[in-house]
Amino acid sequence: MFHDIYGHELDVLHKLAAELAERCPELASILGRDADPAMARLLQRVAFAFARVRQRIDDDVPEIIHAIFEDIDRALLEPVPSTTLVELAAHPKTLRAATVIEAGATFTDSAAHPCVFSMTEPCEVRPWALRAARVVGGERREIRLSLEVLGGAELPRAVGSDTIILALTGALPSALDLRAWLLEHATAVRAVSGTTEIVLARNVVAVPRVRDSSKQRHSLALAPLRDYFACARVFCRVALPGAQQLASLGAEVRRLDLVIELDASLPPAIVIDTTTLALHTAPAVSLASVEARVEPAGPLRFVLRTDEPDHRIVDVMDVDLVDPGSLRALTRWTPDAVLRDLDEGGGPILFEVRRSPSVLEGEIDFELSLLDDDGPVPLPLNTHLRARVLTTSAARAAGLAVGDISHATERSPVAMTFRNVTPVTRGGPPLFGGDRLWELFHRIKLGLPALTERESLGRLLSLLNGPARFGWPQAKPDANAFAPLRGLTRRRGSTIAGDEVCPGLELSLELDTASFSSHGDVQLFGELVSALLASALKPHEWVRLTLQLANGERIIYPRLFGTRGGARP
């Protein structure tokens, strides 16, 4: 490996020497390859020194950057989990008022060794049910949702917060198209009960992804794009504002309709019924942090065991040693993570997890050994460690169908039924580690310049494109450069905001839509890229994105002010 690095550095130096010889012909006699032995030795020594520096960076920087990302955005270091949308529903006679189920509630399927899914966002459950959903009128410009208040609940107490979240649960291309159509063409949301009618809102709004603020301290909006590539389904929800006005309809109301008016006819391919829409939903992932015991089972073989009833250690994605005695973890687990043995003067310890296809007894084998100049040295059998294991059931979870995740755990909400209303997506290991993490960090440091060059933006998108890296079917190409991005042009501009002149950027992306599942897919991609650009700008700066599609269509997004260091006042 060092020989390859040295050869590369030497080639670069010879290339620079040749360029200098062209500019300074009087030096050409000594700058040519092998033209002068003394110069050749000098270049070899410089190349050797550079190669040593580069090898040191390759060896040490990934560990350092990993620790830095723990503070910047820990979510990017986590595995890509299997994900679904779970719908919660109250039993008809038990819930009298709107109730918020906090993130962390868990659900499972009925298998002998089940997959456990944890909610990643709070979910507000109201004591009403969606009884019907349909498109009204020959022009298909009105969507009507029929709600029934359950049991002894009264409408004023059932309302809860001011926003009703509507999940779009049809086939993904259709759901993305419906999302785009509602966001662009909804002109009013009305509530109708008998002869009484009230206007709740003048539009439908997108539901932002809720992220754990403790995991993200950097403003650059990278994680939403990672989520988009891996599971666009989590964005298929819209919000109907103005819900608290429903209380004015009165406590005696048992049935009401929510009507969404459109200024353009809904395409016939988009189906509206109770199978393509759902209330009271939240994303849930097959990913859990589990306390485990590390028990010796041979000179080099150890077993991870857990006593937590809701989780089994199935596919290990990450292992972090806790209280390891004489060992200290300098980095989170990766396939070649290095630990240090303090008693032996800092000698490296190789820590390797062997992924097991079996889920019997909730165990998985791994190897832990001391590495010296002669190879691995076994640790004593009396070595006992504790670990925190990030585990997922990705291999099994991706085979679950709609409705399979419907069984309770010790952390499931009581007096409610639940089921997954969308298919379960695939899961995979962490996207970033080693050189990939170093490259991502480098592009973050570049900021806006890394986002306004076609090659650089394409590479950043490819780094976030987990399905392409994992080789999943129907992934957007590819893992090295984002192929659908065909061109990029930019133009500086300015606008007046109050009494301030704000500089900005008009950015146009030429996009090949063949790799996108639908027009709504393209629309969502542009929204997230626009947010990414804004997150690299200061609050007094702005960006406006335009997508140029192959069929000549243009999608123009609203001007966004920068969110770097906080939102614009």
Question: For each of these PLM feature ranges, what is it?
Answer:
Residues 105, 253-262, 383-390:
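Short, aromatic- and glycine-rich surface loops/edge beta-strands on solvent-exposed regions
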Residues 101, 105-107, 158-168, 270-278, ...:
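Extended Gly/Ser/Thr-rich low-complexity repeat segments
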Residues 1-22, 27, 203-251, 257, ...:
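Mixed-charge (acidic/basic) macromolecular-recognition segments
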Residues 1-194:
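Extended assembly-interface regions of large multimeric machines
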Residues 102, 115-121, 198-204, 399-403:
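Short amphipathic beta-strand/extended segments with alternating polar/hydrophobic composition
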